[in-house]
Amino acid sequence: MSEPLRVDVVFDFVCPWCYIGKRRLEAALEDWQSAHPGGPKPAVRWLPFQLNPDIPSGGMSRREHVELKNRPAGPDLEKQKQVGSLARGLGLAFELDKITVQPNTLDAHRLSGCAEKLGRQDEMVEALLKAFFMQGISLNDHEALSDLATTVGFDWSQVAAYLMSTTDVQVVARLEQEVRTAGVDMVPFFIFNGKVTVSGAHEVKVLLEAMEMATTAETAAVVG
């Protein structure tokens, strides 16, 4: 195998299933590399998708957002428990009660794209997901985002200036439009070698099946 496996992950920072999917992908990639010793390391790219693009740039009340989203039935508490249980099984201690602000995720996706240019995208994505789901940090707080960026090697003042600008706003919009035009309407959504897709946070074995298929398939295929 001369070419590395390419993995594109369409995701949003406020989607708990995306964090679960990230952990399952990591486990699948570890198994993949064990099964292909000496092969090139898979290349993972995170692509933006905003589940709630109409939320104001400063975010909105989490409680209000949940109430609006779940009318008239109200929040599905059983589903929330299921997500929390699955997350704990993967070592993710979600603290959803700490989330008071439902953010607009444009700035977080901008930071993700900026980090990609420096080869640190996965670390940035992990830092932002952890901050939101485990600490309740607002992803619209530029000071908090700048602090988080320093944990993966960025300069605080440069990140703060970047977030205050409009740099990469149109890049995020273009990338999101491209995946929506391609038919992506939910996240997480995995694309292996540009042709084999998996929609949803499936088990590791499903992701591995897609990886194997992606190295041999000549046409597009859907797995899971």
Task: Tell where the protein language model's regions lie, with residue ranges.
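Structural alpha/beta surface segment adjacent to cysteine/selenocysteine redox centers
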Residues: 23-132, 221-222
